């Protein structure tokens, strides 16, 4: 009688363990796919991501550049107006030279806005591509779960361990689905911001001709655009170190314990912590870039 009951408890525990393995492997496949999408998008140019959106952004930039040419003259005149103390003093050699240099620099940057914008994109993409090979988003927990089940010394513990694994696997799969979606959205949102930001550079850069009083508009655009460009590098760094940093700590916890419950907690931590860490870094990538660049 008790032998049959023990076999039943062991069988139910094994079924729960097998279900948890299947659920976690499915979640692992989802996370791996999300990581592959992120790596591919981080190493893809905005033109390669959506050629139609890039074409629209280019047309809009050319339109804004025509307006920017007029703004260049306007900001120069406004800067001249605010800098002069009297009409006679405004034509001194030092004033004329200073305003001439300011206008020449502003005009040169204005004419090179598209080149600078695409150059920053290309450079940030090369940085991200260099880290792509070191990014790993895969995991396999089959042996870990089976090892924990083998540590259960009684049928009751065997059943409880399998049941705990099943509940943890369900919760873990829900978390994986959420963070995978957030990770993909964080990367795709960057392209949308780039498509919007690039055309407005043609309107912001001419403010340099107005001097300190108006140049904050241009510097604001440069800070924002640089943050959009280089945040993919932060995303790739987050993906590269998250699994090694947090996953290694959780795996160390698993490897030094013979308690099934601790192994369950360590297994879930080895899956969830790298993901949540990576998503947190990706969501704050722009602010991290600004802090690193002193913006």
Q: Where do the language-model regions lie?
A:
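Non-cytosolic segments of integral membrane proteins
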Residues: 12, 16, 20, 104-200, ...
């Amino acid at each position: 009688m008790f032998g049959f009951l023990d076999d039943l408890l062991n069988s139910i525990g094994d079924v729960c363990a097998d279900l948890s393995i299947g659920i976690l492997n499915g979640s692992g496949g989802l996370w791996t796919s999300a990581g592959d999408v992120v790596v591919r998008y981080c190493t893809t140019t905005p033109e390669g991501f959506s050629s139609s959106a890039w074409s629209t952004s280019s047309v809009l930039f050319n339109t804004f550049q025509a307006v920017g040419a007029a703004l260049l003259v306007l900001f120069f005149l406004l800067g001249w107006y605010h800098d002069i103390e009297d009409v006679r003093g405004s034509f001194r050699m030092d004033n004329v030279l200073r305003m001439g240099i300011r206008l020449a620099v502003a005009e040169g940057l204005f004419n090179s806005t598209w080149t600078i914008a695409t150059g920053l994109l290309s450079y940030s993409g090369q940085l991200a591509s260099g880290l792509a090979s070191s990014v790993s988003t895969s995991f396999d927990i089959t042996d870990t779960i089976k090892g924990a089940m083998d540590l259960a010394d009684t049928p009751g513990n065997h059943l409880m361990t399998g049941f705990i694994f099943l509940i943890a696997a369900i919760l873990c799969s829900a978390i994986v689905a959420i963070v995978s979606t957030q990770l993909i959205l964080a990367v795709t949102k960057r392209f949308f911001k780039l498509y919007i930001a690039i055309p407005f550079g043609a309107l912001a850069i001419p403010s340099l001709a107005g001097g300190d009083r108006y140049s904050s508009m241009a510097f604001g655009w440069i800070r924002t655009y640089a943050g959009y460009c280089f945040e993919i590098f932060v995303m790739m760094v987050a993906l590269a170190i998250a699994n090694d940093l947090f996953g290694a700590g959780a795996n160390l916890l698993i490897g030094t314990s013979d308690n099934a419950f601790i192994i369950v907690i360590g297994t879930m931590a080895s899956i969830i912590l790298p993901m949540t860490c990576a998503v947190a870094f990706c969501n704050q990538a722009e602010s991290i870039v600004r802090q690193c660049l002193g913006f």
